[in-house]
Amino acid sequence: MISKVIKDKIDIDKILIVTFTNAAASEMRERILDAIYKQIDENPEDEALQKQIILLNKASICTIHSFCLDVIRNHFYELDIPANFRVGDTGEIELLKQDVIEELFEEKYLNNDKEFIKLINTYTNYRDDESLKELIITIYKFIQSSPFPKEWIEEKVKMFKIDDITDDFSGTIWGKILLESLSEDVKDCIIRLENLAKEMKKFDELEKYIKVIQNDTYELQSLLNNLNTWDSAYNHSNIEWMKWPVDRKVTIELKDEAKKIRDDIKKKISSSINKVLLYNSEAANNDIKEMYSILNSLKNLILEFSDRFKYKKREKNIIDFNDIEHFALELLVKKDDKGNLISTEIANEYKEKFEEIAIDEYQDSNLVQEYILRSISKGNNIFMVGDVKQSIYKFRQARPELFLEKYEKYSIDKEQGRDLKIKLFKNFRSRQNILDFTNLVFDNIMTKEIGDILYDKDEYLNLGANYEPPENIKSVYAGITNLEIIDLKEDDDDEEENDSSKSIEKNESDEPIVL
């Protein structure tokens, strides 16, 4: 973005730079200011650069919440909120939530609300109702990361609605997920059995044991072939395991190892079947139908809490951090006649204002923020910076998949004339040995299934700084990755603690671990 100001001559107040923290915003301002001053030193007559010093004071370099708050303050009259609204502090907001939930529960008790009493019987331990209160507030907080919380929760609860309990359960999303999970377990065990049989065939003495393994494979393959429908899977879920032969004359070590592997497979399959295929379709559908009734009541209670909480905030002229994003979304996004999301007139004003939009730490954005920033962009003027490996805010409903979707879709080829991806793989903070170790670990543990990204040589970190060669450093650790394992687990056993201390002392005196 600095080059946009200096090289492309874009006024700094025509650029929106969204950072994750206020500190990052301040740092960005300083970096831009330093870069401008450096250019002025080289080109003291450049009036355009001097102009940027003045414009920097009103430049939009801020967090997403600061930007949204600015949108709200400039258009509060569209939201039916007073001009003197304020953002409530965390403690005040939490106390208000507790007041609202207490009042709501008290009213439900007084009215002997049947749906409410059913929820009490389902989610509490009969001593108090705190667990249900906590559940309502937790779900309420969770759905605020959705652009449209009410629609989201109604859609999710509707997934539990069963129209005909006689339909095969595999037709539901729940049945599909469970059968897919069981199928993966069965496939894994079949591969293990086939590999085991291949090894055992090297020994003629293991022929009768091989027959058992082959029978196991046949039984599991039969189950796998019947996992296309629920009732078919249920009817074939009784695996007939052959008895393992006992022959003391066979002393080959692989025999005992094979039995251990087989026992582990039997345990895994039995556990998977008992977790998944508990009932036939009708019974499973009945369970989901009963769950729908309960979840629908829970949804209604959450939405009622949401409405009351919103009313209480209006009474006190306060908004919270979730309101900041949702009010901005309300001002910037609307649905057309076909239900498609489009930019409002207010959003179009911001489109005209900003020539470029830059988003830092994009991997930690949520869907509300995505809709907001997309609504004010021209479509091809957003610059996103992120690293999915640094995504640590999923518990706050960050959506790293937004980053991954673009990472997979965008091209590194400028000539293709479409959305461009620039890979930043040079690391300026670490020496080569640290990078080698990091690449080694990530290469082995990060896959599409675990970590959402395939960490291969195209993703490796590369040395970017010029460090002094290890041979010139007078240290035993030069060029070596020293791996220190710190066990923070508390242990009440004094004897074990003493043993652990001795072990740590020994490790500290040993040579570093070379990797």
Model-derived segments and their meaning:
Residues 110, 371-374, 390-391, 447, ...:
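AAA+ P-loop NTPase catalytic core and its hallmark functional loops
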